[in-house]
A protein has these predicted regions:
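C-terminal structural segment of proteins
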Residues: 1-292
Length: 292
């Protein structure tokens, strides 16, 4: 069977990655179900001798932090959804907390990590739009160096990222917003819980002197990669918050390329995204940061 390694320190992990490619595991909530499905279809499983060795990073304590700085918040690669929900982060992170509550069941939330959700790069990953709406970037470490990559550049396609074989995502970095900024997250699915998204939306607003001074709106599950609605964001700049929900237009969604599949038609996804954006902006205007 393939090798299994569980380093206790970050340098050890980076050294192993520099020597040969590994399959990295944190919570394992995506890797193991995918491997089981592969076996069911007659393909090699996770322990097949021909597969790359497994690198389990769960013993690296340096990756289990949430740290606050004057200009940013850093979320370590081992921070779970439950830890995000229970954190004392400000209202700017309400959208992340709401997305965390939508990820699977309690067991998945206790094991799964935000960083793993980003690295899995599913078009329907709940964490991606929530973090895109916060201008998140990811820190990729390698032996002897590191680089910070904007989240919108990190995910390059359906389950594809720019992570190199010798790199490990160690941190999610979120810039600190203006005081009073809020975010929210809304999801459309075939049922209320334990569902893969048909469409989802995260939105964040910074308001000063009665005007919007920063709007960030991201849509997931409506393209191969979650996307920011930059046209709408630009138009909302300088407007009154109460006018934002009524300012959503059909052309704001031109950058999306929703699929027709067993969950929904492309037209339904696009319509659902517009409804969710309007509702999310309305929730923020009325002070409902964690709208449901």
């Amino acid at each position: 069977m393939s090798a299994y390694r569980r380093p206790a320190g970050l340098n050890d992990a980076l050294g192993r990655l520099s020597a040969e490619p590994h399959r990295i595991i944190a919570g394992g909530t995506d890797v193991f179900p995918a491997a089981a499905a592969a076996v069911g279809w007659g393909r090699p499983g996770i322990d097949h001798p021909g597969r790359a060795p497994i690198l389990d990073i769960t013993a690296i304590e340096a990756l289990s932090h949430i740290r606050r700085f004057p200009d940013r918040v850093e979320i370590g690669a081992l921070v779970t959804w439950t830890e995000a929900i229970e954190s004392d982060l400000p209202a700017w992170f309400d959208g992340v907390r709401q997305a965390a509550r939508e990820v699977g069941g309690r067991q998945i939330q206790n094991r799964g990590t935000l960083a793993g959700n980003l690295c899995n790069a599913s078009p329907a990953a709940d964490g991606v739009p929530a973090l895109l709406a916060l201008d998140a970037r990811v820190r990729l470490r390698r032996r002897g160096g590191s680089r910070d990559v904007p989240l919108e550049s990190f995910i390059t396609g359906n389950r594809r990222t720019c992570l190199r074989p010798e790199e490990l995502m160690t941190t999610i970095v979120i810039p600190s917003p203006a005081p009073g900024a809020r975010s929210t997250f809304l999801k459309l699915g075939a049922r209320r819980y334990l569902v893969i998204s048909i469409a989802m939306v995260a939105a964040g607003l910074e308001v000063r002197d009665g005007r919007i001074r920063g709007a960030r709106i991201a849509v997931g599950a409506c393209s191969e990669v979650a996307r920011r609605l930059t046209r709408l964001e630009a138009r909302l700049e300088g407007t009154r918050p109460e006018d934002a929900p009524g300012g959503v237009r059909e052309e704001d969604f031109a950058s999306l390329s929703p699929l027709n599949d067993v969950r929904a038609s492309a037209a339904y996804r696009r319509h659902g995204a517009r409804v969710l954006v309007t509702r999310a902006l309305g929730a923020l205007v009325h002070g409902e940061g964690a709208a449901r």
